């Protein structure tokens, strides 16, 4: 098992996923909802997490086999869902959301389940709603 190639790949994918925070950030700035810091912090933490995983192994030039490929897919679903919780946890507009509920919301979006634990969706900022829908779109792209 070549853990170095797994860490390098997950780090690279996390850095790419960090850019998923940019469209909701722009939506927040357009509607002036005041939630932009949650997306800035999420972008920064996700990009930094990816960089920490990728940097030590950036020179590794090995190809991964089936075993590493399966581990990358499994780890990526979990890691991506964990980092996907950040905007839900950092936002001020959804103050009563626990970590498990935020993780459920993120995993539900990325697996295109469509289930939600958020109540009163009409009161949730448009940027958070856009982020939820974007997670579902990204999950759909991952399934295709």
Region locations from a protein language model:
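Membrane-proximal intracellular helices of multi-pass ion channels
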Residues: 1-144
